[in-house]
Amino acid sequence: MGMRPNGALPRLTRRSRRLVAASLVIVVLLLIGPRLVDTYINWLWFGELGFRGVFTTVLLTRLALFLIVGTLVAAVVFAGFGLAYRARPVFVPAKGPGDALAQYRALILSRVRLFLIGVPILIGVLAGVVAQSYWMPVQLFLEGGDFGIKDPQFGLDLGFFAFDLPFYRFVLTYLFIAASIALIVNGLVHYIFGGIRLSGRSGTLSRPARIQLITFAGILVLLKVAAYWLDRYELLSHTRAGKPFTGAGYTDINAVLPAKLILLAIAVICAVAVFSALVLKDLRIPAIGLALLLLSSLVVGAGWPLIVEQFSVKPNAAQKESEYIARSIKATRDAYGLTDDVVTYRDYSGTASSPAGSQQLAKQVAADRSTIANIRVLDPNIISPAFTQLQQGKNFYAFPDALSIDRYQDKNGSLRDYVVAARELDPAKLRDNQRDWINRHTVYTHGNGFIAAPANTVRGVADKPDENGGYPEFLVNAVDDNGKVLSDGPAPLAQPRVYYGPIIASDTNDYAIVGKNGNDREYDYENNAGTKNSTYTGSGGVPVGGALARTVFGLKYAERNFLFSNVIGDNSKILFNRDPSRRVEAVAPWLTVDSGTYPAIVDKRLVWIVDGYTTLDNYPYSQQTSLSEATFDSQVGRTGGALPNQQVSYIRNSVKATVDAYDGTVTLYQQDEKDPVLKAWMKIFPGTVKPKADISDDLKRHLRYPEDLFKVQRTLLARYHVNDPVTFFSTSDFWQVPDDPNAPTGSQPPYYIVAKDITKNDNSASFQLTSALNRFQRDFLAAYVSASSDPETYGKITVLTVPGTVQGPKLVNNAITTDNQVSSHVGIIKNQNILKWGNLLTLPVANGGLLFVEPLYASPGQGDQSSYPRLIRVGMYYNGKVGYATTVRDALDMVFGPGAGATATAPAVEPGAMPPAPPGGQNVPVVPPVTPPPTGSAELSSAKAAALQEVQRAIGEVKEAQKSGDFARYGQALKGLDDAMTKFTQAR
C-alpha cells in the first residue's frame, strides 16, 4: 500500500473535482446572484427616474476603488509572500517526525500557486470590499473646491479639511494596512521556510529575511511620519473629555502640536536607523530606534500634554482657553448657519407695556390680528385619529400618526396654516381576500385625496354632551363617488390619486403592478352602482411585461406570479421604492434627509416636499453634534421619526426636493447657492440638481424651514449665543431646550405657526417655526426663537431675549392645569374621557407680551379605535392670569378683558358642514356646559357661600351620575349643576 508524502493533500478524482466545481458555482451564484439582480433592477429604476448618471457614477467609483485598493493590497501582500518564498533556504533540516514547520512547508509546497496567488487575492478582495464604501471622500477630493475661509491655526482654506484631509487619511490607512499585512506574511513565510530560526533566547536571520523585514518595517515607520503630519491638522476638529468645545485648545496648541512635530522628527530618525541596518547589518540600531519612538510617544505624546493640562491649564482654564473658545464660537456659528447676517437678537420685555386688565391692553391684543386670528388650536400630533375616523372612508386608507402643518391663502387672500395629510393606502390594513397577491398588488394600488383642516378653528363648540362640536373643519381634494375630482381643498388639485407616500411604502413588499391590460383593475371609488376601477396613466414605473423583467422581479420578490399571472401584460409597469424620503436618498446618496416629509399642493400637483442636508464632520473648531440627540424630542420618541446617529460639525439645508405623489418624479433644487459642499456634489453629478431659480413661485410658498435643522440650531444657540469666551466657559449665561410639559420624556418640539412677522417686526402674517428656550437648568424663559419660512425672508432667525422672571413652559403648564376652574372642570370629565393637552404655544403679543396657548382634547372611552379626540377647551396664560374657555375668543377675553378676542377666528357653525356623529351616539366626549368656580369660600358673602355649597353638591352629583352610567340621571345632574352655577353667579 502506497504512502502519501507527509503533509501532502489527497488528490481528488475527476468526478469529485466536477462536484466540487459545480458546488462552488452554485455557492457563487447564491452569493452574487441577488446582488446582480438588484444591480440590474436599480439600473432600470434609476433610468426610469432620469438619474441613471448617479447610478453609473457611484457604481464605477466603487468598482474603481475596489480594483485599485484590492490590487494594491494584493500586490503588496504578494510581494511580501513571493520575496520570502523565492529567498527561502535550499535545505532546512527537520527537527523530528513531529516537526510542525515541516508539515506547513510540505503543505505550501504542494499548493504553491494556491498560497502564493490565492492568499494575496483573498486579502485584496477583503480590502477592496471595505474600501469601495469610501467612494464619497474620493469623489469630494477630486471635485472639491475652496470655502474662501482660512482656518485660524495653519491658515489653510477649509476646503483642505473638508475635501483633501479625509482622502489623505484614507490613502494612508490602506498603505499602512497593506504594509503591515505584507510584513506579517513575509515574516511568517521566512519562519516556516527557515529564513528565521528561533532557538531558546537567541535566533538567526538569513540575509534576505533581514533585508526584506527591515524594508517593510522602514516603510511602516515612514508611513507613521506621514500620520504624525496629518495628525496636526486633525487636532482642529477633535474632542477631548472635559473640554467644553470642539477643536484644539491651549494644551493641544502648546503641547500636543509641538509633540507631534517632535515625534515626526523622531520617526524620521527611527526610519533612518531602520534602513541603516541594510548596510550596517546590526539589528540593534533599528531596535533602539523603534524603542525610542515608542518611549517618545508615551512621554512626549501623552505625558507632556497631560502635565500641561493638569498643572498649567486647569488652574487657569478660563483665561488659557479663551482664545480657542473664541475660535470655536466663530467657527460653530459659521458651520451651522448662525452668523450675524442670519440671526438677529432683540431684547423683549415679556410683558406688555400696558397694565394687565386694562382696556388699552385688550385693544393692543386685538390689534395683533395676524397672531390672534391664527392662534392654532389643532395639534397635528393629537388629531390624527379624528382624521382617520372622519375622513378615512375605507378600511385600507390611513393617515400618519403625526400630521403635518403647511400654509395656504384662504378665499380672502389671508395667510392661514392648515393641518394637512394625504389619504394613503395602508397595506397593513388590508384584510382577508384583500391581501391576495392580485388584490394587494394590482387592485389596491393607491390612495385617494389630500385632506386639510384650518389649524385655527374647529367645527362648532364642544360645550354640551349632545352637541357634535370641536372636530376639525375638513377641506378635501379627492375623487368623489361620481368619479369627478372634488377640489374643495385650500388649493386646486388636478390629480388626487396617491401612488407614492411613506405609508403605502411601509410594507416589506412595496410594489404595485399597473398599466392597461384588459379592463380597468385598480380600485378607485364606490357609489350606488358599485365599485369603480381605474388604470394608472402616469409616467412612473418600470416596464415589467417582458420575460427578462418578469424573471428578475420574480427573483427579487421571490414571487412566481410574476412569471405565471396573466394580469401582467405587455403594457404593465411596476411601481416600487415608493417612500419619498428613500427615493431622494437613492438619487442623492450624499444627502442627509430630514425626517419631516410633508405633502403640499404645488401648481395643481400633489407633491411630497423633502429637505436635504449636506454635512461634514471635520469643520475646524466647530462643535461636534449628534444629529440623533439634537433632534430627539417628545414627539420623535412617540412617532419614531429621527435622524441617524451621525456626528456632524457642519450642516446646510442645501437641497429642496419634491416627489410627485402620482408619478414618483423626483426633482432636486439648489437651496443654498453658497454651500461649497453642494457645489462639489453638483460637479460630481452634473445635471441632477436644478438651480434655485427653477423653484416655482408656488413651490416657494410651501417651503418650510426644516424642523430637524432648527432643532440642531436651537440646541447650539443655547450655548453659542454667548459672545464672551470667559462667560462661555463658566456656562452662567447658557440656555437649554425645555422639556415638554405634556410628555413623560423628551424636549418640547418646535412648532409651525402663522403669526405676526417678528423678522420684519411688523404686523403682517408670517409662517414661522418657533421654540422657547429656558435658562440653564431652570424653568424660567430665556429666549423665544423664530425662523421665517416666508419666501422674502426665508431662513432668517430672530431671537427675542427675555428677562429671567418670565415663566417657562413647565411652570406655565402647571399654572394652567392647577388653576381652580381648570382642575375642577377636568376632574368632572376625566372619568369617562381620555384627556390630552395639546401643544403649548408661545406667542409674542401686545408690544412686549408673551401669551401661552394650550388646547385641551377629549376622547371618549379608553382609547379604542372608535375613540377620537375633539377640542373641548382652550387654556391660556399671560403674566400670572389663566384663561379657560370653549373658544379662543372667550379665553382671550378672560385673560385680557372684554374685546381682546375680537379678532380671533370663531368656530365654524354651519350645521350642514358638521362631521358625522360617531356611531351609536355614545362616543362623543362628555363635556359639561359650564365651568365651576373656585372651591375656596374665603371672603364670600353668606349668600355666595351657600350658593357655592350648592355648586359643590351639584358637582358631586355629576360625578356619581357618571359612575352609574345612567345617561338620564347624568343629564339631570348637568342641569342641576347649570342651575347651581346660575345661582352662584347671581348671588351677592
From Swiss-Prot:
Pfam families in the cross-refs: UPF0182
Keywords: Cell membrane, Membrane, Transmembrane, Transmembrane helix
Topology relative to the membrane: Multi-pass membrane protein
Main localisation: membrane
Record bears the keyword Ribosomal protein: no
UniProt-annotated location(s): Cell membrane
Transmembrane segments: 19-39, 63-83, 114-134, 176-196, 211-231, 260-280, 288-308
Gene Ontology cellular component annotations, sorted alphabetically: extracellular region; plasma membrane
The family this protein is said to belong to: Belongs to the UPF0182 family.
Annotated protein name in UniProt: UPF0182 protein MAB_3498c
Organism: Mycobacteroides abscessus (strain ATCC 19977 / DSM 44196 / CCUG 20993 / CIP 104536 / JCM 13569 / NCTC 13031 / TMC 1543 / L948)
